[in-house]
């Protein structure tokens, strides 16, 4: 039995609240157990200099935790004068995950800024951010599509993420903070609805792990991601119908 009473192959309860803020084209509060993240998607009618004139768009992410999202207050990056390595890594993985399922040429020369702000952290903040950010992205893209329909609808598939690990010699899905802090092996997995992998981040925190461990952890992750994508679909309802159609 786990610390919160779940089975080893269960994710925490997931709740996705859309249109959570007033101004962003897409905004979501995602709650994954006691982890809570506000995700917004904002559209800008320009692209970074390296994409100017190429006829394609860009999706980029900023990730942050409010100071008391954690048990002990963490100073804001601005007060430290730099973005720490963990924050930079998480921003990049969220951006890569979203870009992997979007036809950037179909967007045209626009940038979609995704902001993920953790307001309460209990493990899995990066994976919850990816899952919530995708829903915010869909809402933002749909607003563009309704205003001026795309020739090709840009979003090709759902994408979501989950953590898995080995705690007390037991393989577990969707680790809370206490489990994550005790994990001998810790892994974050990003997958699409069609079952393709976008990213696998795996580390033997205390011990090496076997090929069999990897196989079983990926199977657990796939099960969890199916549940997360089901929550995304339940949240989006009819607004997800264009995904993967090319706009037909």
From Swiss-Prot:
GO terms for biological process: rRNA catabolic process; rRNA processing; tRNA processing. One of its GO terms (molecular function) is 3'-5'-RNA exonuclease activity. It is an enzyme of class 2 (transferase). Phosphate binds at residues 86, 124-126. It holds the Pfam family RNase_PH_C. InterPro entries: ExoRNase_PH_dom1, ExoRNase_PH_dom2, ExoRNase_PH_dom2_sf, PNPase/RNase_PH_dom_sf, Ribosomal_Su5_D2-typ_SF, RNase_PH, RNase_PH_bac-type, RNase_PH_CS. SUPFAM superfamilies: Ribonuclease PH domain 2-like (SSF55666), Ribosomal protein S5 domain 2-like (SSF54211). Keywords: Nucleotidyltransferase, RNA-binding, rRNA processing, Transferase, tRNA processing, tRNA-binding. Its EC number is 2.7.7.56. It catalyses: tRNA(n+1) + phosphate = tRNA(n) + a ribonucleoside 5'-diphosphate. Belongs to the RNase PH family. HAMAP family: RNase_PH. Phosphorolytic 3'-5' exoribonuclease that plays an important role in tRNA 3'-end maturation. Removes nucleotide residues following the 3'-CCA terminus of tRNAs; can also add nucleotides to the ends of RNA molecules by using nucleoside diphosphates as substrates, but this may not be physiologically important. Probably plays a role in initiation of 16S rRNA degradation (leading to ribosome degradation) during starvation. Homohexameric ring arranged as a trimer of dimers. This is Ribonuclease PH. It comes from Clostridium kluyveri (strain ATCC 8527 / DSM 555 / NBRC 12016 / NCIMB 10680 / K1).
